[in-house]
Amino acid sequence: MGGMRHGRVTLHLWLAATAIGAAVLAAGLFMTERAEERPLLAQVRKAFLPGATTSGHHQIELACETCHTTAFADADSMQAACTRCHGDELKAADDKHPLTKFTDPRNAELLTSIDATRCVACHVEHRPEITVLMAVTQPDDYCVLCHRDIGTERPSHAGLAFATCANAGCHNFHDNRALYEDFLLRHAAAPAQLPRQLRPLARFAETAAMLPTYPSDRYPLVPLDRTQHDAPAETPTVEAIAGWLGTAHARAGVNCGACHRDSTTSAWIAAPAAEACATCHALESASFGQGKHGMRGSAGLGPMTPAQARLPMRRAAADTALDCTTCHGAHDFSVRRAAVDACLGCHADRHSLAYEDSPHAELWRRELASDAPEGSGVSCATCHMPRTEHRYREYDFKTWFVQHNQNDTLRPSEKMIRPVCQSCHGLSFALDALADTELVDRNFAGAPSVHVPSIDMAVARERGTGTE
């Protein structure tokens, strides 16, 4: 009898433990509260991660609901989560493998090899053992599934291994804006150095003057002096006022209250949140939330810190929370500091550490010293946060804004060619330089030591000579 009672007690304890475990698992997977505000929830989610996340998603791995929008989300829900974040980028890239290609009945048989209508067919999360560059979870030679006859159709490709399709300067699955044949031919003869080497300049005040929505009644676009600041008498410091006076804000009539006063109650806010910046800098703010620096905020998590990065970072900056003022400062809003010094204050990878001794850095120093024209220097931001054209269709004019989504020109590296490299360099030189990994690590100090034959192949095919 005693053995039976002991068995029943053991069973009850096991059932209770199972119920508690199930409750903890359910809470960890399906609660939508911010995990960072609930340490126990964060620990539960970490414990139940089915595998390491990719470098693109690791920052938001505790915000499970970002991708898993419902409990046991079906394929359509997961696909919707992918396109919610990445859909606009694919449209802008003129995606070469869009959904319409595979819903065309003529291509139906291709789906028997790989279901390219679903992002997760090629990008499976939590599977580090099969994940390669750009979070791809297909074998390197997956192009053969649909393009097995390419060696016959293009003699120049005969004998090339299918694992080389995605080599630098050749092909990308989605974004080929700098790689398609007509583009290669159009820029085939461009020299390594272009005659006009100036980056476009962002003129926010000029843009604001053209926007009917800008509150010009409260902040007329006229310069302000020290006596015209509108901060409470007991609030401003000499340093804060001095910093503000030297900014584009003061020169454009943007007073202290534009950032520090609550728009509803007019109460003074000592430390405005990033939302205050977004009031005027909406494009920059939105793109910041799409990149590595700001994506955690978009997922409802706390700010990114360098300690959370997977790239080498400076130890002294490990716990620095990233927001607008981290790089720009709280009153002087220095775009020059944000363009280089702020970057090198955190990043400690080979490419970043080599910047100061690079030709690009020398051009930047010459511009800062007024020994070269404005727009001729090359800072970290010149390449990784380039000026991007934006058209206000409702007002029928266009302007330039600073793209704060670093990923927009980062991977694959050919995405950088049109908005960045071709501001100064010819296409062939740019393709070769980006394909030279050692040169990239040296921050482009020197000439490329590799050659990408894409342009050569396109020219030979156009002329009807060579292997084409």
What is the predicted function of each stretch?
Residues 28-37:
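Hydrophobic single-pass membrane-insertion segments
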Residues 13-29:
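Hydrophobic membrane-insertion alpha-helices, especially the h-region
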Residues 1-7:
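Cytosolic juxtamembrane amphipathic/interface segments immediately preceding
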Residues 215-217:
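Hydrophobic alpha/beta core scaffold segments
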Residues 11-18, 41-47:
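Hydrophobic transmembrane helical bundles of multi-pass organellar membrane proteins
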Residues 8, 28, 210-211:
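Short N-terminal secondary-structure initiator segments
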Residues 39, 44-213, 222-467:
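Inter-heme linker and motif-flanking segments adjacent to c-type heme-binding CXXCH motifs
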